[in-house]
Amino acid sequence: MQIDGYTRLAAVVATPIKHSISPFIHNYAFEKTGINGVYVAWDIPESELQVTLKNIMRYDMFGINISMPYKQAVIPYLDEVTKAADLIGAVNTIVNRDGRLIGYNTDGFGFFKSLGTFADFDVADKVITILGGGGAATAIIAQAAINGAKKINIFNQTAFLEETKEKAKQISSKTGAAIEVFPVEDLNMIQKKVLVSDLFVNATNVGMDGKSMIINDSFEFPPNLMVADVIYQPFETPFLRLVRSRGLKAVNGLGMLLFQAAAAFELWTGKEMPSQEIWQALEKKYKSK
């Protein structure tokens, strides 16, 4: 990678962020596509957020990725947000287009691109049951609604149920999607909804410890159920291990990470990311952990 006076910058902004795999993904893509760009990680306090966004235009950057805890906080400083970002209420990609800052959310797109690529799954006219109501879950729910899902069942913690219901109502009113919200503590209801679902998603952090899962070993799955977990470290959570032991298709969150990045890269550069090459490198890295 040759850095010169014409090199353009992209970055991921969050706190903490030094652990991010995004610089590896995007710098690999810049090098392989021959684009004169560099991608770095900026760990900044919220008090510096507005000036950081101004610097996108000041330095003629491609744009930036936004991670927690700033996905909502950046929205007032943007000139425009896309339909998906507006539905989700969060932005993960900002594009510098002709001096205007446009906010996108590529998380939901990345999730369903992963399912389509690795499991040949299309969410249109399908029934989904999803565990979780946070940022990743909301992105998946909104994208599923945009893509024409028939029914979406959301299970979230009782403490956040009213907030989740309000968000679901907003998404439903703007897309026409049928959405219901239930307490995640009600395992019997989860079982009931999963038995009539086409897709079952864990969008919580339960399983990151490599030991825990929300459902139990006696849980029943319908044949041909597609299963996904947004977690990618560990590479196989107890949840995924259980469903694979029953012979079901299942994917982890690494593909979502890659394809949300690929969508951002294409928005910035107009070039397609060499996703297959990068996937092989990521798989090697995380399978060994």
Curated annotation (Swiss-Prot):
Q: Which cystines does this chain contain?
A: none
Q: Name one Pfam family in it.
A: SDH_C
* Listed pathway(s): Metabolic intermediate biosynthesis; chorismate biosynthesis; chorismate from D-erythrose 4-phosphate and phosphoenolpyruvate: step 4/7
Instruction: Enumerate the residues binding NADP(+).
Output: 132-136, 230, 253
One of the GO biological process terms: shikimate metabolic process
What's in the keyword line of the UniProt record? Amino-acid biosynthesis, Aromatic amino acid biosynthesis, NADP, Oxidoreductase
Catalytic activity annotation: shikimate + NADP(+) = 3-dehydroshikimate + NADPH + H(+)
EC assignment? 1.1.1.25
What job does this protein perform? Involved in the biosynthesis of the chorismate, which leads to the biosynthesis of aromatic amino acids. Catalyzes the reversible NADPH linked reduction of 3-dehydroshikimate (DHSA) to yield shikimate (SA).
Question: Which HAMAP family does UniProt cross-reference here?
Answer: Shikimate_DH_AroE
What does the record note on quaternary structure? Homodimer.
Q: What is this protein called?
A: Shikimate dehydrogenase (NADP(+))
Encoding gene per record: aroE
